[in-house]
C-alpha cells in the first residue's frame, strides 16, 4: 500500500476537494459544519476527515533556537496548566510531559497527554535553566550557554514551571 507524503501547506490548500489521510486527523478537536455534510464527508471515503481551516501552527509544533549565548525551546501547551506539566533534565535531554485527565470542553469530554524530548547542547549551563508558562499557553524553556568546557551535570532533575501573566510575544529572528 502506497502512502502519499504531502507537505502540510499543500494538503490544506483545496480543503474538502482533496481529503486528508487518516493519520492527519485532529483527534480531540471539535467538528466543523462541513464535517457533518454527507456529500462532502462520507461520499469520498468514510475514513477521511477534511482539515479545512486548520492552522499548521496549532498542531503542536515547537520552536527550538540555539543562539550564540542562549538555548531556547518554545512549545504551545495552551490546553495544559502548570500543574499538568512536568519538565525534567535527564542527562543531556530536556523532557517535557503534559497530561490532564478527562474534562469537559465545548465539544464533549477530552483528555490529553504528550511527551517531547529535546537534546541540550553541551554548552548549556544546566544548573541555570528556567521554564516559564505564559498567559497565552506558550511554554518557554531557556538556558544560557557557557563558553568554557565545564563538566555538565548528568542527573535526573525536575525544572519548576513558573507562570507568567503576560502573553508571549514571538521573538524576532
Swiss-Prot record:
GO cellular-component term (any):
cytoplasm
Q: What is its main location?
A: cytoplasm
**Can you name one GO molecular function term for this protein?**
unfolded protein binding
Residue ranges of every copy of the sHSP domain listed in the record: 52-164
Provide the residue span(s) of the region labelled Disordered: 152-173
> Where is this gene product found?
Cytoplasm; Nucleus
Q: Which residues bind Zn(2+) 2?
A: 107
Family in the record: Belongs to the small heat shock protein (HSP20) family.
Q: Specify the protein name.
A: Alpha-crystallin A chain
* Gene name tied to this protein: CRYAA
Amino acid at each position: 500500500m502506497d502512502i502519499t507524503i504531502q507537505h502540510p501547506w499543500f494538503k490544506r490548500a483545496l480543503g474538502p476537494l482533496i481529503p486528508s489521510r487518516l493519520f492527519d486527523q485532529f483527534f480531540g478537536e471539535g467538528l466543523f459544519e462541513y464535517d457533518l455534510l454527507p456529500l462532502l464527508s462520507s461520499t469520498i471515503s468514510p475514513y477521511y476527515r477534511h482539515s479545512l481551516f486548520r492552522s499548521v501552527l496549532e498542531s503542536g509544533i515547537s520552536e527550538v533556537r540555539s543562539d550564540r549565548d542562549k538555548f531556547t525551546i518554545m512549545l504551545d501547551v495552551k490546553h495544559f496548566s502548570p500543574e499538568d506539566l512536568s519538565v525534567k533534565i535527564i542527562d543531556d535531554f530536556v523532557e517535557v510531559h503534559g497530561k490532564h485527565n478527562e474534562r469537559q470542553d465545548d465539544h464533549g469530554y477530552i483528555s490529553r497527554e504528550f511527551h517531547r524530548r529535546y537534546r541540550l547542547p553541551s554548552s548549556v549551563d544546566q544548573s541555570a535553566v528556567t521554564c516559564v508558562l505564559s498567559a497565552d499557553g506558550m511554554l518557554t524553556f531557556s538556558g544560557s550557554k557557557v563558553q568554557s568546557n565545564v563538566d555538565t551535570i548528568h542527573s535526573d532533575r525536575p525544572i519548576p514551571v513558573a507562570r507568567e501573566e503576560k502573553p508571549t510575544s514571538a521573538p524576532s529572528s
